[in-house]
Amino acid sequence: SADITPVITGFQGINAEGDITTLGRGGSDTSAVALAVALEAEECQIYTDVDGVYTTDPNVYEKAKKIDKINYEEMLELSSLGAKVLQIRSVEFASKYNMPIRVKSSFTNDEGTLINGEENMEDALISGVTHTSDDAKLTIRKVPDIPGIAAKILDPISSKGIDVDIIIQNVSEDKTTDFTFTVKREKSQEAKKILSNLSKEFGGGEIELNEDISKVSLVGVGMKSHAGVAATMFKTLAEKNINIEMISTSEIKISVVVK
């Protein structure tokens, strides 16, 4: 009514100190969802260079299919595991306020992909497959097998802002164990240096760093009600002579680290 058209920046904002700052990669996605919530819109439409969310990266597998509808939980997993269609904070915000998101192409009139809170257990067992090749695996040998040792290893890592993903601790042998975890490759040398200092402190063994790994993940809410998905995945990899080095699972996700 005031004949005013607001123009709002999507990629920048103001922090707690009142300074202008950027929101990071995909920040405009989060801004769009926040505005949709504030304006009580029916849905938030995000236009991009792809026409929706696909079952996997179509640049890697040309037979990837576009997903018509997916729920917040699955989209959060896909975003956190490497799918670059939506910024993870935008999906978290949409889930918190139950704001549907529709991802559409700027170049076509296709309906795109709708992301909302509905769960349809009759849908496809697996919604998507993701892969990342920017991880590194670190192992510290002969760690004393005592209570609190995992926290002692990971606290200095997290205090430096290094995110730890998959963690494995071997069965104790001679009161020592091997402790293995993954981090982003760009942080691997810093993490290795921290582990070297820790190993000297509590008499641990050598530190091993492997940057030649990839992580492959299956995501699907249908896994909540279907058994045998992990076994099928592992059998398929074995048939291609691909050895699994680490495994991580949740109700709707299976991730494996391979060479």
Language model region names:
Residues 1-259:
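C-terminal catalytic "cap/lid" subdomain
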